[in-house]
């Protein structure tokens, strides 16, 4: 957002660039993320059947519907909202950089072309790294709620586990 303001409104962005402000924003973000992730400690549990202890990847069966609701809210707050903000900011920056300067003729200056390429690369990497995981996780949780075959569940579970490290 700061970078976007720097491109779209350079003079206004000067007051947002102070280190004290950046530290406050970072602290608030960390507190929010920790608060949003704290319920995982409640949902991720173990269960005992006889002498066998099972560590649940998501939650115990009886809590799973609540876990899916929690995960959906977290998907919105911690992925969809930031992804949308990043997408909008970078698209606005690219549009501004591609716009010819007043009174100039000819092609786009090399520095602006390089900036637009960097914007495209950042968006591509962010999308490639985060979108597959969130899509497969959402599908996996949704499919687990339905009565689907083990083959289908195993296939989506494999895709989910493959995209986790991204």
UniProtKB/Swiss-Prot annotation:
Membrane topology: Multi-pass membrane protein
Topological region Extracellular: 46-72, 137-159
The keyword Cytoplasm appears for this protein: no
Cytoplasmic side stretches: 1-24, 94-115
GO molecular function, one term: G protein-coupled purinergic nucleotide receptor activity
One Pfam family linked to the record: 7tm_1
Stored PANTHER family: P2Y PURINOCEPTOR 2 (PTHR24231:SF17), PURINOCEPTOR-RELATED G-PROTEIN COUPLED RECEPTOR (PTHR24231)
Protein name, entry field: P2Y purinoceptor 2
Organism: Cricetulus griseus (Chinese hamster)
């Amino acid at each position: 957002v700061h970078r976007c303001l720097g491109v779209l409104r350079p003079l206004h962005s000067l007051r947002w660039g102070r280190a004290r402000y950046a530290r406050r924003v970072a602290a608030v973000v960390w507190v929010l993320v920790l608060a949003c992730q704290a319920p995982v400690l409640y949902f991720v549990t173990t269960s005992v059947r006889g002498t066998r202890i099972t560590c649940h990847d998501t939650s115990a069966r009886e809590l799973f519907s609540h876990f899916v609701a929690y995960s959906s809210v977290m998907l919105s707050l911690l992925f969809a909202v930031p992804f949308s903000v990043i997408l909008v900011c970078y698209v606005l920056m690219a549009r501004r950089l591609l716009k010819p300067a007043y009174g100039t003729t000819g092609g786009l200056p090399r520095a602006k072309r390089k900036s637009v390429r960097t914007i495209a690369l950042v968006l591509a990497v962010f999308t490639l790294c985060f979108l597959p995981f969130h899509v497969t996780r959402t599908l996996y949780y949704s499919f687990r709620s339905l009565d689907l075959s083990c083959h289908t569940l195993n296939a989506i579970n494999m895709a989910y586990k493959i995209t986790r490290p991204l």
